[in-house]
Amino acid sequence: YNGATWSGSGWTGQPLMMKWPKKVKKAMNMYDWAKEKDDLVEVIYACMDGYVYFLDLETGEATRDTLNLGFTFKGSGALDPRGYPILYVGAGYDSNQGTARVFVVNLLDCSVMYTFGNNDPFSLRGALSYFDSSPLVDADTDTLIYPGENGILYLIRLNTQYDQEAGTLSINPDHIVKWHYYGNRTSVASYWLGMEDSAAVYGGYLFVTDNGGNLMCLDLNTLQLVWAQDTLDDSNSTPVLSIEDDHLYLYVSTSFRLGWRSSSSAEVPIWKIDAQNGRIIWKTSYECYSDDGVSGGVQSTIALGKKKLSDYIYVTVAKTGAQYDGVLACLDKKTGEVKWEHKAYYAWSSPVCVYNSDGSGKVLYCSCGGKAYLLDGKSGKLLDENEISSGAIEASPAIYNNYMVVGTRDCRICGLKLE
């Protein structure tokens, strides 16, 4: 559309997975065999061809007809955390059906219950209305929390009515609250308003980065900005929350958009931030390159180690060392010291930690060179690699038990079994 071609699964492009209760499946438009399969885990994947795909995690077989929404979906969307059969997914580009928007989909029959965000006069970016973020739902208040690249944070009370026994579902959105902001260095040419990452929320406070190089803490009850920290550049990395010694910290990074800070290369820090006041605890930096339209730095979300990996964080850094090179870096949470690096083709994909029953862990990530890598989380030793695509893998993998699923730019959805 409009001279742009979008193929396969893009950034962030993480599939969603759900093991629906049998009573819920009974009311769904699934194929009969899928309804009857007791251990079915359904993969729900919105892709850049405008379709949402529904697949059996174990086999890749379609569990129901594809849903054609007619817009490019780069982001991952979200399922309702209450177990309600609702999909929230935002379009990442306009189409011949109009400007991009958010869809709220009833997964009982795949009907669209509600759309919003397109041509919003409250936007400070005109008609631009892209949504790459994954939203959150506050169960206590039945409120959808959705950041947009149009610079608006949407808070929408859904008034959800779901009767599992009857197999009925409806929403009646009202009390729609919108928040937007101005950036001191924002212009038409650079440091744009807008949020492409996803928000993190803790105790009534929302943390989000933006295209304008800001990490913001917002009080959701007053919609007052508590603090802002300079992240230097177009930031697409979702802040990751970590409680350490009864104190809340954030791990986050940024990218390098060519021409904003430099026409060649620029520093890309990885930060540990005090969530209470925005103070920088430590930073570890990489020098990164960019192509026009293909940014280096950190496009991914940092993986927080748990269990026997609880001392570490893992982050993919793109276009460092050389234009097409990158690293998966393991950093010490307390100091920011680099413990090890795995060097390969650069990656936009977020790493995922997986654990054995004894608490030992491995790290899995995918590269824009088409490979998936599995490494020991402590030593960084390469345990396995698999070239699963002849094109790039920009999307982030999702893992359920010992199955991994990821989409590729060459129009494949791949399932791998981890052993």
Annotate each language-model stretch with its function.
Residues 1-11, 16-89, 93-131, 136-419:
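Extracytoplasmic/lumenal domain signature
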